[in-house]
């Protein structure tokens, strides 16, 4: 992921899905683009999920480089601007 936003959340009452939706909403308001990829700390998900879930259109994966209570949300691909506009 080349484009993203680091999100901090320490509310233990929120589910990972709620946190991802909240971060995605903020990301859209800030950048005007829908995120499609999110990295979360290792051990966040139930082991039966094999380290990956889908939250709406967002692919959520565990990653060793993400600190506890954080997530990295953004685009799994580079957005190409239309030079003709």
Language-model segments: which ranges?
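Amphipathic alpha-helical packing elements
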Residues: 1-48
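C-terminal edge-of-domain segments
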Residues: 54-85
